[in-house]
Regions:
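Bacterial Sec-dependent N-terminal signal peptides
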Residues: 1-25
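Feature activates predominantly on carbohydrate-active enzymes
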Residues: 92-310, 351
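Active-site neighborhood of glycoside hydrolase catalytic domains
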Residues: 260, 272-379, 385-387, 392-399
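Acidic, contiguous N-terminal accessory segments
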Residues: 18-149, 357, 362-370, 377
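Active-site-proximal beta-strand/loop segments in catalytic clefts of secreted hydrolases
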Residues: 53, 110, 185, 240-242, ...
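Flexible loop/turn segments at secondary-structure boundaries
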Residues: 58-59, 159-161, 187-191, 244-250, ...
Length: 402
């Protein structure tokens, strides 16, 4: 009997000693901060159930769909201990996670929904590249190297449907991006529906020569649905309304906010440049108090939909020639003691910054809003031009976030 027991023990020891690492390295995008690969493997056939805190069940549902779509694996949620266990650990820093793959169980620990998404994204990437339908036994400890990891979508020049936006959010989560910047308005279209101004999306998305492209915009319900879905993916959406320039589509609906009045037409990107009308008059009248009342209505509409602490208010590429010929703008210029026409935009920038801050939000603007140092320490700049490095340095020296 003793001999048999010794033989069994020796055989078990032999099996253990022969066990090797399934792989020597794993490929993740982005690279994880720390990866330790151990001997042994977890068979994917054992991944059958997920135990997750109630607050993260929608995120786990997303992962279940991702598994079915990318790896043809069918997994369900369970209230008992699953083969994948997701645990909340508030000691972990923002967006950090730990992923432990053992021979008989997988465990993800995170302190917030972003960390959960990142842990699941790493697991999904490992599953998609699995060797012989097995995952290596390993430990990953990871957190982002950069706080802002974003993607901008120009929804004004090219309309993205709700389903297309959700698919984009899926891809963003896969690569652990955390911010979607939605450019909602421009000369080409005004995509933001506002109850107080029903003609905005009617006239601001109408193209006489491209009827098939007309009438595409986002209702409040559409945007709230996108925001909610983004939240389950751990992604923040920052809305942008581009003012005081880039406003042809706005002026098509509200020409009274222009300096000269008259008829304006939204200009689809597909329209030939030679057929675009009044393109040089794409700014609102800063000397008209109605422009500021409208801007506040826009801010209120964005706050109702988007929980982000940020509102991007544009501010790029604003010529001053029309303002210089506008009696209302020049009256403002003289009344405020301005010394250059560019200060007309600076006046608008400061007013918007104060207004947005008074509503508990932070204004973001394109780099041009700080050409004459109009941005304040509470504002954030988005640098986009080729000379942005120098502008960035100057802004940072003045205590402005970039």
């Amino acid at each position: 009997m003793k001999k048999n027991l010794l033989a069994i023990a020796a055989f078990a020891l032999l099996l253990t000693s022969c066990e090797t690492k399934l792989v020597e390295k794993v490929d993740l995008i982005p690279l994880a901060e720390n990866v330790e690969i151990h001997k042994g493997a977890f068979p994917l056939s054992n991944l059958q159930s997920i135990q997750v805190p109630d607050e993260w069940k929608l995120t786990a549902d997303n992962f279940v769909k991702d598994l079915q779509k990318t790896a043809s694996l069918t997994v369900s949620l369970t209230d008992s201990e699953g083969s994948l266990v997701i645990v909340k650990d508030e000691s972990l820093s923002a967006e950090a996670y730990r992923l432990n793959i053992e021979k008989n169980r997988i465990k993800i620990e995170a302190g917030d929904i972003q960390g959960v998404n990142h842990g699941l994204a790493s697991l999904l990437q490992l599953i998609m590249t699995a060797k012989d339908a097995q995952l290596p036994v390993l430990t990953i400890q990871d957190k982002p190297a950069f706080g802002y990891r974003g993607l901008m979508l120009d929804c004004a020049r090219h309309f993205w449907t709700v389903d297309e936006l959700k698919e984009t959010l899926d891809h963003m989560a896969f690569f652990k991006l955390n911010t979607l910047h939605m450019h909602l308005t421009d000369n080409q279209a005004w995509r933001l529906s506002m109850d107080k101004y029903p003609d905005l999306v009617k006239e601001g998305t109408y193209y006489y020569d491209f009827p098939e492209l007309s009438g595409k915009y986002y209702s409040k319900e559409d945007l709230k649905e996108i925001v909610t879905y983004a939240g389950t993916r751990g992604i923040e959406i920052i809305p942008e309304v581009d003012l005081p320039g880039h406003s042809i589509a706005l002026l098509a609906a509200l020409p009274e906010l222009s300096c000269r009045g008259g008829k304006f037409e939204a200009t689809p990107e597909e329209r030939d440049w030679n057929k675009r009308k009044r393109g040089n008059e794409n700014m609102i009248c800063i000397g008209n108090p109605q422009s500021f009342a409208f801007a506040e209505d826009v801010i209120d509409a964005l706050i109702e939909i988007f929980p982000s602490q940020y509102i991007h208010f544009g501010g790029d590429e604003v010529p001053t020639d029309i303002w210089e010929e506008c009696p209302k703008c020049m009256a403002l210029y003289k009344r405020e003691g301005m010394k250059s026409p560019g200060e007309i935009q600076d006046y608008f920038t400061r007013k918007m910054s104060d207004l947005i801050r008074s509503k508990g939000k932070i204004m973001i603007g394109w780099g041009e809003i700080n050409d004459r140092h109009a941005a304040g320490p509470n504002d954030v700049l988005t640098i986009w031009r080729d000379n942005g490095v120098e502008k960035q340095k100057i802004a940072l020296e003045h205590g402005i976030s970039v």
